[in-house]
Amino acid sequence: MLLKDFLEKDLVDIRPEPAKDWRDALQQAAGKLIEHKYILPGYINEIIANVEKNGPYIVIVPGVAMPHAMVESENVLGTAIGFAKFPEPVIFDSDDPDKQAQLFFPLAAKDPKQHLQNIGDLSDMLMTEGLIDKLLAVNSVDDFKALIDAGS
């Protein structure tokens, strides 16, 4: 998986305004997946319900969230991963500073194998030295494109 995949599928969203809260952030972060008909809005409600029940499992490392729910969801229409960046960190748990995120990678997959593959590929990509810091510095789709052109 490469960053250019997000750009080629028009799934990059640099949010100009901070989210009101983590629920609002999830709604906004998945906007491109809804717009391009990979998911229905009900999928976001499933993710919100899962976070309310299980805690902020979607924050995989400080600063990065990977919103996803069950693969068997009738609200998933296709397989895709989006990218959204907020200007300020979104707090998921005010008692745990590690449970905040500014970078969101919403996932949708029709196939359980592909879902696990996408999670693994995304996790591997995010372990690239310095990539998270570079993504945090992105302030526009053009910045994102420049990051890709620079070889990230």
Predicted features and spans:
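Cytosolic covalent-transfer regions centered on His/Cys nucleophiles
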Residues: M1-S152
